Amino acid sequence: MGKKSTLAVDNVFCTARYEAAKENIAFQSREATAPILGIDRTRLANIELGKLTPYPEEVLTMSKHYGTPEICNAYCSRYCPLGKSTVKELTLDDLDRLMLKVLGSLKGIEQLRTRLITIAEDGEITGTEQTDFEGVLQELQDVSQNAQTLQLWAKKYIDDFNSK
């Protein structure tokens, strides 16, 4: 069994491998993991130590083999030049907590719809409407983020969802 790297303990890719090793002992060491992933052992070490940024294809391979779809989101939101400015990092909570967040963000959806209709009815956004419109956009962003997190949770934990 490989020993745990203390230098890479906070690295998302190393953490994903350690989690996968709980289910598959082949992921306990970089030496055993590298050929499974098709990534050179030294390159894998440098990725896990934060010295190299993995290629998107490598992240997809890790995600598939480790069963951790959340590392794709982490890659996009932290490392990808385009994603850093457009993708929010999602955090997988327990299902009950996640459902409460989703339900909380949906509770005011009817008022949100009404506000959007009021803002858009004259075909332009005036001074006072702009502040309200920005608030609507933020609420929609919260709904979207909660929906994406729920989809990520389902992809990780529900086998039927994974096969689609």
Predicted features and spans:
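Short alpha-helical DNA-recognition segment
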Residues: 21-46
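A short, Lys/Arg-rich alpha-helix, primarily the initiator
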Residues: 1-26, 139
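Short, charged recognition helix plus adjacent turn
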Residues: 3, 75-107, 157-164
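Charged, low-complexity intrinsically disordered regulatory/assembly segments
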Residues: 129-164
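Residues in the recognition helix of alpha-helical DNA-binding motifs
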Residues: 16, 36, 47-50, 74
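Acidic, glycine-anchored loop motifs typical of Ca2+
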Residues: 90-95, 110-135
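DNA major-groove recognition helix of helix-turn-helix/homeodomain DNA-binding modules
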Residues: 57-75
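Generic structural signal for well-ordered, non-transmembrane alpha-helical segments
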Residues: 60, 100-110, 134-148
